[in-house]
Structures are given as C-alpha cells and as structure tokens.
C-alpha cells in the first residue's frame, strides 16, 4: 500500500489513536500522520501509508482552522477541557471592541506554546511536566498567521467569538485563544476547534473512520498530494540511474537551484523527490527521496 488519506479526525481521539485504527483497518504497520491534532479537535488529519510516510515532510505546510474562543474564562490547558483558573464575566463586551485586537496576531509573531503540549523541554514533554505540577518558563516561538476572519459572535456573560484562521505550521490556536483573552484583559480559552485544511487537504474532501472501514480502497496518490511541486518524467535509462542514487543531468536550465521536483516514470510510476543542484555549470537533479514500489 502506498499513498495518503484525508482523514476527518473524530472528537476525543488522539492523532495516535487514529493512526492505530488506520493500521488495523488497512492491515499495515507503516502508517503516520502529518500533524498532531488535540483530542478535543476535529477535522483534517493527513495520513500517510507505506513509503508515503517518507513524503510527509514535503507536503504543503499551511493550515486552516475554524475556532470558537470563550472569552472571560482562563484554563490551565488553554482549552475548555482544562481546569478553570480565572473567570471574568463581561456581558458588555462587544465584537466591535474585539475586532481591532485581532490584527495584532496577523503576520510573523512570537507565540508561547501551551504548557499542556507535546513540545520537548530538557528531554521531557511539557504536558508531562504540567501534569506533575512542574510549571516552567516556555520560550516563545516564531509562527505565522496569514489571516483571521470573524465568522460569528455570541453575546453573554462569557462571550464567544468564532474565527476562521489561516496559518503556518507550528501555530497553536489554544495560544491564540489565551493571548486574545489577555489583550482584552478578560481571559480566553479555546471552546472548540476544527482543522479545515492541512498539508493541502481540505475538510470538504475528507473521510471518516467509518467510511474507511466500509471502503479501504482509493488512497490519494502522490500526484495529487504533491501537486504544489514541479514534476518531471524519466526515461527507463534515467530511472535506473535514479534508483542507484545518481544525480540526473537536466537539459532544461530554466530552473531554480535548491528547488524540489517530484519524479515519475513515463508510465506515471512515482519515483521520489529530487533537489536541483549545480556542478561545473551543469544543472542536475539530486535524489533526496527514492521510492521503489
């Protein structure tokens, strides 16, 4: 088996739970995912099967989420599943007062990950430390948020705002919820989260585990998953050189050094990914990932 799945992760499942279930359904051990989703979250969880696990790092990085943020409430996990640590009811808070602050989170920003996260600190995961009551300083990380759009606003003692968020890899929406609450001086926590896009896969095209159990055929091909890359077809002679790890001379000089190119045979068999390099004024495609099916 070789290819990808666009899985719609159910609530209360870890990403690892989903991988284990897919392994069982497809009867294969070589399965991986393209980016962890918190157990409470739903939505797109890219799954790679077989040798496609080697291609996960080459999928598009941008992600999109639909998030509901509860204002006036702070929790230890920065989401609604955690323990409340502060409340600040604010029934008079309006959307007009919140909107200007959303712009503060657009662009390249420094973001502190939640204490309850899988990030390593001194060889241990942060959530392991948090569960033992060891709260430590977490260094901010640079992340990029491209767009934030307001979808809905619910008034009340604890107002709720629903957002459509487009961002880069590594962005924590729980941190965004917490930090929005901080700038408003009322606190905030993530009430619900759905990932609508990840690694080039869209929620509208996803399948759930029940559907996969009924029909486990039809993995997504690299041709679709790697459509953002340039592609090149090799003759049988060049395929042999490719399989031996030799760099392939390119006749087309209209290329960008360092760019990645997906490779297939004339029969459309996927062969891997190469990087364009230059040596002695000649352009070559250097194998990075070689796939022999």
UniProtKB/Swiss-Prot annotation:
Gene3D superfamilies: Pseudouridine synthase. It comes from the Bacteria. SUPFAM superfamilies: Pseudouridine synthase (SSF55120). It catalyses: uridine(55) in tRNA = pseudouridine(55) in tRNA. Keywords: Isomerase, tRNA processing. The active site is at 38 (nucleophile). GO terms for molecular function: RNA binding; tRNA pseudouridine(55) synthase activity. Pfam families: TruB_N. Its EC number is 5.4.99.25. One of its GO terms (biological process) is mRNA pseudouridine synthesis. Belongs to the pseudouridine synthase TruB family. Type 1 subfamily. Responsible for synthesis of pseudouridine from uracil-55 in the psi GC loop of transfer RNAs. This is tRNA pseudouridine synthase B.
């Amino acid at each position: 088996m070789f290819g990808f799945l666009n899985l719609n992760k159910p609530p209360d499942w870890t990403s690892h739970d989903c991988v284990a279930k897919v392994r069982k359904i497809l009867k294969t051990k070589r399965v991986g995912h393209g980016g962890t989703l918190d157990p409470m979250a739903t939505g797109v969880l890219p799954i790679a099967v077989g040798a496609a696990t080697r291609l996960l790092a080459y999928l598009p990085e941008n992600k999109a989420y639909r998030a509901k943020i509860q204002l006036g409430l702070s929790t230890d996990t920065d989401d609604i599943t955690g323990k409340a640590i502060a409340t600040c009811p604010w029934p008079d808070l309006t959307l007009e007062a919140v909107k200007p602050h959303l712009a503060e989170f657009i662009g390249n920003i420094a973001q502190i990950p939640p204490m309850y996260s899988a990030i390593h600190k001194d060889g241990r995961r942060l959530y392991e430390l948090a569960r033992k009551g060891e709260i430590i300083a977490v260094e901010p990380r640079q992340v990029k948020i491209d767009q934030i759009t307001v979808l809905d606003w619910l008034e009340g003692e604890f107002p709720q705002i629903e957002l459509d968020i487009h961002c880069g890899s590594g962005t924590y929406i729980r941190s965004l919820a917490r930090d929005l609450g901080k700038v408003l001086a009322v606190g905030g926590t993530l009430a619900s989260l759905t990932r609508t896009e990840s690694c080039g896969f869209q929620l509208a095209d996803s399948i759930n585990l029940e559907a996969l159990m009924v029909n486990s055929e039809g993995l997504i091909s690299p041709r679709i998953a790697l459509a953002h890359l340039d592609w090149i077809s090799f003759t049988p002679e060049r395929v042999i050189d490719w399989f031996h790890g030799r760099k392939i001379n390119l006749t087309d000089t209209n290329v960008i050094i360092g760019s990645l190119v997906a490779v297939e045979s004339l029969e459309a068999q996927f062969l891997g990914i190469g990087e364009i390099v230059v040596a002695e004024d000649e352009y070559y495609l250097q194998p990075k990932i070689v796939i022999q099916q």
